């Protein structure tokens, strides 16, 4: 099992953009994917070859202390953020995100943005 900690907000996956007949990924999404891949290489060593299971906790930074630890029902879509995480780990933690057969995710209020990703 590997545990990856990202100490920043992860950009949810954005729709592809079209310009002059070409398709491209927005720069915010690309930079977020690159940062996650770099952090995985720095913090973790395992390359998974079989089935992959992921547990993800997305901590959303808010100033109100009363909300800390509570489920977050606003801000960004959880599924788009999961897509960014899974895509960024292609050829880094596993060959392709099609190997991921089970994902559990939580979005929780916290004092600052960070993400904990468990992969097994």
Segments (PLM) and residue ranges:
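Acidic, proline/glycine-enriched N-terminal capping motif
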Residues: 1-120
């Amino acid at each position: 099992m590997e545990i990856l900690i990202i100490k920043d907000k992860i950009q949810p996956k954005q729709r592809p953009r079209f310009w002059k007949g070409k398709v491209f990924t927005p720069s915010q999404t690309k930079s977020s994917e690159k940062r996650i891949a770099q952090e995985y290489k720095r913090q973790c060593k395992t390359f998974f070859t079989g089935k992959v299971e992921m547990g993800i906790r997305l901590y959303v930074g808010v100033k109100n202390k009363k909300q800390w630890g509570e489920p977050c029902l606003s801000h960004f879509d959880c599924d788009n953020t999961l897509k960014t995480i899974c895509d960024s780990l292609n050829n880094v933690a596993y060959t392709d995100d099609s190997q991921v057969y089970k994902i559990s995710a939580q979005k929780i209020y916290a004092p600052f943005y960070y993400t904990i990703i468990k992969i097994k």
